[in-house]
């Protein structure tokens, strides 16, 4: 449990392709100590990592490698470092994406990334706006993070994306969301990793409470 928020250091990964300030402002409003960085020293000394993301998958992966954070993130997850990944940040955790050209990801989560355009017929792509989350009770980590349920049930969160993840294992899925005729994985919870396709930092109090609850549940 986190006793003193100001002493809990959060490293927001800067790989030159993301809107860092909205998540920084959200975490600061919760009184957490944040730093925007790609420094190995800062990342290693942090208590939690945030991997945000806006942009193209292949460019994002390339930038992670250029800033030497690609292998570092893989290593830290192996050692159970707490991580929050958002939108493209969530997609980069997977093995590959078909956006523009097939590109390998971090392979932290088994599965890959697909375009809505392959599955949708009547609704507009991208998926933009507020939508519900349906909890997957088969998730293997929900017992530890049980307090998250009350911040998900009957709450809406803000989405903006054209691609979605398809995890190999249902036990990694925290929530599903339905967009027209497609039911997709909208968040992952695995050990100390929370990954969201939606933007909690743009989801008002619902998003702030979800972030705060996850961090408070970390041992």
Regions found by a protein language model. Give the residues of each.
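Acyltransferase
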Residues: 2, 192-219
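Extreme N-terminal starter segment of soluble prokaryotic enzymes
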Residues: 6-11
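Short acidic low-complexity segments
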Residues: 34-45
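Cysteine-nucleophile active-site neighborhood
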Residues: 48, 55-130, 212
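Structural motif
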Residues: 50-52, 195
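Pocket-forming structural segment of enzyme catalytic cores
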Residues: 97-181
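Beta-strand-turn-beta hairpins that frame and shape the catalytic cleft
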Residues: 154, 189-193
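Short, surface-exposed beta-strand/loop micro-motifs that present aromatic residues
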Residues: 182-189
């Amino acid at each position: 449990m986190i006793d003193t928020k100001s002493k809990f250091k959060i490293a927001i990964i800067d790989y030159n392709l993301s809107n860092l300030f909205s998540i920084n402002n959200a975490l600061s409003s919760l009184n957490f100590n944040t730093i925007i960085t790609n420094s190995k020293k800062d990342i290693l000394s942090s208590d939690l990592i945030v991997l945000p993301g806006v942009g193209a998958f292949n460019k994002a992966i390339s930038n992670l490698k250029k800033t030497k954070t690609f292998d570092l993130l893989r290593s830290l997850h192996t050692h159970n470092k707490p991580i929050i990944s958002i939108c493209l940040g969530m997609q980069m955790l997977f093995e590959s994406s078909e956006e523009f050209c097939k590109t390998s990801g971090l392979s932290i989560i088994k599965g890959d990334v697909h375009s809505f355009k392959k599955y949708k017929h009547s609704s507009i792509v991208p998926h933009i706006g507020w939508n519900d989350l349906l909890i997957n009770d088969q998730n293997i980590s929900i017992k530890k993070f049980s307090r998250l349920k009350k911040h998900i049930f009957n709450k809406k969160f803000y989405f903006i994306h054209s691609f979605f993840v398809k995890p190999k294992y249902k036990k990694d899925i925290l929530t599903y969301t339905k967009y027209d005729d497609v039911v997709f994985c909208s968040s992952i919870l695995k050990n100390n990793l929370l990954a969201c396709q939606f933007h909690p930092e743009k989801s008002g109090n619902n998003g702030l409470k979800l972030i705060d609850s996850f961090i408070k549940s970390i041992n």
